[in-house]
Amino acid sequence: MSAYLIVRSDTSQIDSKDFDYWYENEHLYEAKKQFMAKNAKRGWVQNSNFHLAIYEFENIKKAKNAMD
């Protein structure tokens, strides 16, 4: 059964366009690789400054290992 790690970022104090570019073009791939995640998705919470990244793992053990 898959397990998920959800990361919420408050971008209200930074340039959200720069953050968006960095996350999409650099960080998401690197984080997925570092976490050894099966899949990774990202997006924005509508009408807010919050960004979400969702990392999918094969099981809860692998998700917990990503946080160590």
Where would I find each of the regions flagged by the language model?
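Macromolecular interaction modules
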Residues: 1-68
